[in-house]
From Swiss-Prot:
Site keyed Involved in tetramerization or stability of the tetramer: positions: C20
The protein's name: Aquaporin Z
Gene: aqpZ
Organism for this UniProt entry: Photorhabdus laumondii subsp. laumondii (strain DSM 15139 / CIP 105565 / TT01) (Photorhabdus luminescens subsp. laumondii)
Family listed: Belongs to the MIP/aquaporin (TC 1.A.8) family.
Keyword Chloroplast listed: no
Enzymatic reactions: H2O(in) = H2O(out)
SUPFAM superfamilies listed in its UniProt record: Aquaporin-like
Pfam families cross-referenced by the UniProt entry: MIP
Molecular-function GO terms, alphabetical: water channel activity
Free-text comment about domains: Aquaporins contain two tandem repeats each containing three membrane-spanning domains and a pore-forming loop with the signature motif Asn-Pro-Ala (NPA).
Topological relation to the membrane, as annotated: Multi-pass membrane protein
Length: 231
């Protein structure tokens, strides 16, 4: 069990460090930065590579909504849910702390005013999208993510391609929802950066736990009900 938790901690660390790091650093230059496409690729590539790296140890969740969604889909034991989530949150916070230390070396950096890659809705949505829009986006996209994850790891699926499918799904999800909420679908990712943003991101953090978890349960339940092999 300890090896599984260490794998989840490391995987979530790399996800937050790579994905949120791309937002904090590489997307900060209007003309030279990587933009929405680059950020989307960064999140997808970190998940893809870390599933290949440690997925055989822990399953490669790196996301509390995925862990709960897999449980809802009958693919994960309830007794392991809380330990996995704790490891994921710790890994994310450690990554955000490293990002904060690096970013603090830039003259004029302020995590509060920059947003520090935090997720938000309403006035804190990158595109000014409402709470209602954010609810629909986070639930639907997390549900889709779970359906892809469970389907790609189904024993009937082509072997060896699950990390690629999952990583590309996360790229697509980010391309869709960065303008809406800055893309969460992952409470650990949202928590990690919100702690260092330390104002509005913490006030809205409840949303980025509740909605992705609902979406995860919906996605896991849909796959279990409609697509799982009959026993």
């Amino acid at each position: 069990m300890l090896r599984k938790l260490a794998a989840e901690l490391l995987g979530t660390f790399v996800l937050v460090f790579g994905g949120c790091g791309s937002v904090v650093f590489a997307a900060a230059f209007p003309e030279l930065g990587i933009g929405f496409v680059g950020v989307s690729l960064a999140f997808g590539l970190t998940v893809l590579t870390m599933i290949y790296a440690v997925g055989h140890i822990s399953g490669g969740h790196f996301n509390p909504a995925v862990t709960i969604g897999l449980w809802a889909g009958g693919r994960f034991r309830a007794v392991e849910v809380i330990p996995y989530i704790i490891s994921q949150v710790i890994g994310g916070i450690l990554a955000a702390a490293v990002l904060y230390v690096i970013a603090s070396g830039q003259v004029g950096f302020d995590a509060t005013t920059s947003g520090f890659a935090s997720n938000g809705f309403g006035e804190h949505s990158p595109g000014g999208f409402s709470l209602q829009s954010a609810i629909v986006a986070e639930i639907v996209l997390t549900a889709i993510f779970l359906i892809v994850i469970i389907g790609a790891t189904d024993r009937r699926a082509p072997p060896g391609f699950a990390p690629l499918a999952i990583g590309l799904a996360l790229v697509l999800i980010n391309l869709i929802s960065i303008p809406i909420t800055n893309t969460s679908v992952n409470p650990a990712r949202s928590t990690a950066v919100a702690i260092f943003q330390n104002t509005w991101a913490l006030e809205q953090l409840w949303f980025f736990w509740v909605m992705p978890i609902i979406g995860g349960i919906v996605g896991g339940g849909i796959y279990r009900l409609l697509f799982a092999e009959k026993q």
